């Protein structure tokens, strides 16, 4: 890949869920481009405590504290990436899901972004510039029956992102969404290992079964966190200055429809 080692020089970025997986891929790419990056995570690895803020973004108080700390440390935020998210496996199907199950999915996958945007956007409006990316999921287009609240929340996040882009474009702020498919993060790899142990098959065979379970991946392999990081870096850079309100699917071709 072409390197753009100084394209984000002088810019600051905040990334939620940025210590592992896709979030780390995004953070690493923005740092490589010269950005000053803070990441938010539930816990702070000792070795990275200088650029990590411990935050529970599933609560209003947690998001408020994160926004205040990030602005205090960075002064202003030019790039905001909402990567945090999560899905749980429901037992008993949709009818067994409680209001608490739904609220938890909405708090983590939708309201975390809404609340943090509310804290950070005013500064962007004052400066007349900024770039936001909301990380959604192909489940918003191809939902699985085992994670219905998650899929619904990500669909809502996509629509929120589009509406927000329409509001903020005249103010010089761009908003886009990135929709990843199966990306082999640390947790995804562990899942493949566990499947392999349970079924007495290799990790490669387990990975193939996972890909088949989502309808296959035409490119033949899972994505990498760095792949998503490269896409996000493009979208928040000046190279994408005329792009806003878009959703970019990065799934190796998993979603067959347009």
Spans of model-derived segments:
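Conserved glycine-rich cofactor-binding loop
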Residues: 12, 19-20
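Short C-terminal tail/terminal secondary-structure segment
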Residues: 2-5, 91, 142, 221, ...
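Short, small/polar-rich loop/turn modules that mediate ligand/substrate recognition or access, typified
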Residues: 169, 174, 243-245
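Substrate-binding pocket helix/loop in short-chain dehydrogenase/reductase
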Residues: 91-94, 98-106, 132, 213
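Active-site helix of classical SDR
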Residues: 117, 153, 161
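Active-site loop immediately N-terminal to the catalytic Tyr-X3-Lys motif
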Residues: 142-148, 170-171, 220, 238
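C-terminal helical subdomain
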Residues: 177, 201-239, 243, 252
């Amino acid at each position: 890949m072409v390197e753009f080692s100084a394209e984000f020089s002088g810019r600051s970025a905040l990334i939620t869920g940025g210590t592992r997986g896709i979030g780390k891929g995004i953070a690493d790419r923005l740092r490589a481009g010269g950005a000053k990056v803070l990441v938010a995570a539930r816990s702070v690895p000792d070795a990275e405590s200088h650029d990590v803020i411990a935050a529970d973004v599933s609560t209003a108080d947690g998001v408020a504290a994160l926004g205040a700390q990030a602005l205090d440390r960075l002064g202003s935020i030019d790039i905001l990436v909402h990567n945090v998210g999560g899905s749980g496996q429901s037992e008993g199907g949709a009818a067994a899901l409680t209001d608490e199950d739904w609220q938890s999915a909405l708090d983590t996958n939708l309201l975390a972004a809404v609340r943090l945007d509310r804290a950070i956007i005013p500064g962007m409006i004052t400066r007349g510039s900024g770039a936001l990316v909301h990380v959604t999921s192909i489940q918003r287009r191809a939902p699985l029956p085992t994670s219905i609240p998650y899929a619904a929340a990500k669909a809502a996040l996509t629509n929120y992102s589009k509406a927000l882009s329409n509001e903020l474009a005249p103010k010089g702020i761009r908003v886009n969404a990135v929709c990843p498919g199966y990306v082999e993060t640390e947790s995804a790899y562990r899942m493949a290992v566990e499947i392999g142990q349970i079924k007495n098959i290799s990790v490669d065979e387990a990975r193939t079964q996972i890909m088949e379970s989502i309808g296959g991946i035409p490119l033949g392999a899972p994505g990498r966190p760095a792949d998503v990081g490269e896409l996000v870096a493009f979208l928040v850079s000046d190279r994408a200055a005329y792009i806003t309100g878009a959703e970019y699917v990065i799934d190796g071709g998993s979603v067959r429809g347009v």
